[in-house]
Design a protein with these regions (language model features):
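Nucleotidyltransferase catalytic core that binds NTPs
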Residues: 1-183
Length: 183
C-alpha cells in the first residue's frame, strides 16, 4: 500500500514554504509521496485573483521537478466544481485502490474543520495531518515559515524582488509572463 499525502491549495504561486512543508511532512509522517493538489476552486475562498489553473500547475511542476517524493497534480481539475475535499478523496480512493491517503491541511483549516463538507466521513476514513499556520496550532509540531502567496503577489505588483521566496524557475516563469503585475 502506497502512503500518499494530499496537500491541496491554490498555490497562487507555489513558494519555498510550501515545498519545505511538503518535504518535512513527507519525512515526519512516513509517507511515500506527497501530491500537491492544485485546486481549481476552494469553496471557502474568494477567487478574484486566482491565476489560470494551467499556469499554477506549470509553476508547481517547475518548482517540484527536482524534489524527490513530491509532485504536482491536476487531479481536481477534472472533478465537478466546487471541488470539495471529500469528493476528491473518494475519487482518489476509487482510482488508486492500492494507495492510502492522508489529508494535509493548515491549522487554520483544522480549527474550522467541522464546517467542511462531510468532515466526519473524512475523519472516519482518512488520516488528517494539520500543520501550524497563521497563529493556529496544528496536530504536529513544525516550524512556521512566514511566507504567503498573497505577500508574494503583492511584492510583484509593487515591483519588489521575490528572490528566495519562490524557486528560481518559478520566479523566472512569473517574470517572463508578467504574472501578478496588475492585481
Amino acid at each position: 500500500m502506497t502512503r500518499v499525502g494530499i496537500f491541496g491549495g491554490s498555490f497562487n504561486p507555489i513558494h519555498v514554504g510550501h515545498i519545505a512543508l511538503a518535504k518535512a511532512i513527507l519525512e515526519r509522517c512516513e509517507l511515500d509521496e506527497i501530491w500537491l493538489m492544485v485546486s481549481p476552486q476552494n469553496p471557502l475562498k474568494q477567487q478574484d485573483d486566482l491565476l489560470d489553473d494551467a499556469l499554477r500547475l506549470e509553476m508547481a511542476q517547475l518548482a517540484l521537478r527536482d524534489v524527490k517524493g513530491v509532485k504536482a497534480s491536476d487531479f481536481e481539475f477534472h472533478l465537478p466544481k466546487p471541488s470539495y475535499t471529500w469528493n476528491t478523496l473518494q475519487r482518489l480512493s476509487t482510482e488508486y485502490p492500492d494507495h492510502r491517503f492522508t489529508l494535509i491541511i493548515g491549522g487554520d483549516n483544522w480549527a474550522h474543520f467541522e464546517h467542511w463538507y462531510h468532515w466526519k466521513d473524512i475523519l472516519r476514513n482518512y488520516n488528517v495531518v494539520a500543520y501550524p499556520r497563521n497563529q493556529y496550532p496544528g496536530t504536529i509540531r513544525m516550524p512556521l515559515m512566514e511566507i504567503s502567496s498573497t505577500d508574494i503577489r503583492r511584492r510583484i505588483c509593487q515591483g519588489k524582488p521575490i528572490d528566495g521566496l519562490v524557486p528560481d524557475a518559478v520566479a523566472q516563469f512569473i517574470m517572463e509572463r508578467r504574472l501578478y503585475v496588475e492585481q
